[in-house]
Amino acid sequence: MYGPGVPLYLSYFYPREKLGLRTGIFLSGAALANAYGSALAYGISQAKGSIGPWRILFIVEGVPSCLLAIVAWFCLPDSPKTARFLDEREQEIAVALSLRQPGDRETQGLQLKQVLGSLLDYTSYPPALMYFGCNVCFASLPLFVPTIISEMGAFTTIQSNGLSAPPYVLCWIAIVISAFLSDRVNLRGPFIVGGALIAAIGYILLATQTTVAVRYFGLFLATQVFVSVALILTWVGNTHATDSKRAGAFAILATGGQCGPILGTNVFPDSDKPYYRKGMWISCGACLIVVVMGCWQMYLLWRANRHLDRESEQNGGDLSGDQPEGKNEADRPFRYIL
């Protein structure tokens, strides 16, 4: 739940058109972690001592997160209004910025009715399927990249761990650039679909080619699925006007998405060495799920925006003023980001 929880938290502080880059920076940390994680694991596995290498690895990778979690509990504010590092005027500005999109509304606490409303909102489910497809790859690729490289037949274990880093360095750059551009043009779907398509091409190369250079190039392409992950999380935060409804949508996203690793971590059995074609084709199919669902979500939101435009025209084109809390979303000047 930590992955979807951070974008939800960021949505409390930033307007919709600035959320992509912030979420992208957060997710890019996963790419950087994978860039050095394999080398770190290999180095620790060679350590000699009274404590088993796997125990040392758990300590080295787990203790910093646990300590920072304690620090975050006391230091991270619940909302702009409770940020102790801001004075009263700065808090008011931060709240105004986070609610700048017409239709976005601040609510007091979790509203169960709105959370349940997200279950009935058809726009909550395509992102969950996209997140599932991404997590099939997101969970399996970092685990098996060193093995895939070593099975190419031209590299030692040390070289394989070292060669695992460049694809993720490129991925880190791609996440940040794509998130920045997504904010600039105020679009999410095309970047999600584009990242998944590039990753699908990479998996096709890995499944069909035997040349070492081509397969290694395919890894660079396959890691671009991380771009889609970052912007799917952003898109969910952009699609709902209240914190409670966003929370419900993120719960749906996490529930569907976390089924992906169940499949992803079992698609590269040793019996499929050296090319792991079955796993590559399954991962390619998962990327295509993201492509199809991304296009479908764009269509649904485009259609919803047209409906909202017609409602606005019937009401005289007035997009100003506050609407009563009980009215539906068609009655508020809210427009979906495609």
Where on the chain are the PLM-derived regions?
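Intracellular juxtamembrane helix-capping segments at the cytosolic ends
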Residues: 1-14, 227-242, 250
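Glycine-rich segments within core transmembrane alpha-helices of 12-TM secondary carriers
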Residues: 18-53, 58-65, 250-264
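Interfacial helix-cap and linker-helix signal at transmembrane-aqueous boundaries
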Residues: 40-49, 149-150, 181-183, 267-275
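Structural signature of the two symmetry-related core transmembrane helices
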Residues: 189-205, 228
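Helix-loop junctions at membrane interfaces in 12-TM secondary transporters
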Residues: 208-217
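Extracytoplasmic gate region of multi-pass secondary transporters
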Residues: 113-180, 233, 264-265
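Intracellular terminal tails of multi-pass secondary transporters
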Residues: 73-107, 246, 275-338
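A late C-terminal transmembrane helix in Major Facilitator Superfamily
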Residues: 243-275, 282, 286
